[in-house]
Amino acid sequence: MDSIVTRNVARSKDWLSNQVFPLWFEKGIHAGDGGFVEALSLRGEILDLPRRAMVQARQIYAFRTGMDMGCFPEARTRAVVARAAAFLIERYSAPSGAFFHSIPSASKPGNEQPDLYTQAFALFGLANAYAAAPEASIKRRALALVDYLRRERRAPGGGYTELEDGRFVLRSNPHMHLFEAAIAWLRADEDPRWKELAAEILDLCLTKFVDPETGALCERFAGDWTPERTDGRFVFEPGHHYEWSWLITLHAESRGLDATQVPLRLYRIAEARGVSPGGDAYDEVWSDGVPKKKSSRFWPQGERTKSAARLGAHAPDGEKPGFARSADMALESLSRYLQTPEPGLWRDTLLENGQFREEPVKASSLYHIINAIEEYAALRPGLTSSR
């Protein structure tokens, strides 16, 4: 194995095993109810914030993945995941079959809106809980959520409506996470309803989200699924280009499909237009290639890491070194966000001036970070040297 790769994998796994999971097991789980806390301060203090359903779902995934990577003990993981899944179902469920956005903290109100983004992650969290312990009650709750979406949230032109400020809108990103949830369920359960959901969202992506003229993937849409434009341009996010390219490739692998053209195009657009001269993926870019928001959150760096690694695994031998270089560059970029005074924490946003924004450490972020490390460790050794 390349010495750079060996070092990167060892350093990343050591950080997870000896810094992240000890801290988040001690402080990231509510002592009273077994649910996950929303965030810690940069000093590792628990913050009094409403707790989102998304956090419960993502942390179920993160702890389960930590177990699979050998970074957290199996017995502890199974207990944590089972308790968190029960908490998610008991505290966030609405009579309709939906999940609430958040529950209140000691001093701040929660939010009972059933936004689509929350529904996608609730479905994802339940899939990971089911994979850890396949209980019929978890699957029943997940299918009740799918029934709710199809009964109450269908959009006329396909897909599902999102809620923003009390109004229904159309967005691609929640659908991406529904696709992710369907894939997670397919890996744990062969019920054809998961295959149907995945196929539905993939078709929507290929026919509605990806602009046929530019090849870029739009984020926000009018009611007929036409992109929302400003002066003829729409906004795309390089991080979501990487994320979609990874998900489509992952799904194609598992189902024996041939789907390399769209993922490669999304990836290449992000590489060409969405990465700063310093090697960090931008937050937002106009569809004509002009950067709109030159800040760089941590998660696009993680998505670039795993997209480069997985697409590189399918590339011809002569192209593998390019994917290897991008994976190494992206993981190195991500690693800068993980250098904090208190071990086991992370930064969120690198501003255009090169400084990190001072802000709480969101528990939800670990989902992106550990997924990137897992994919890099599994796939990057199979690519040729990046040197």
Residue positions per predicted region:
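Glycan-recognition and catalytic cores of secretory/periplasmic carbohydrate-active enzymes
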Residues: 1-387
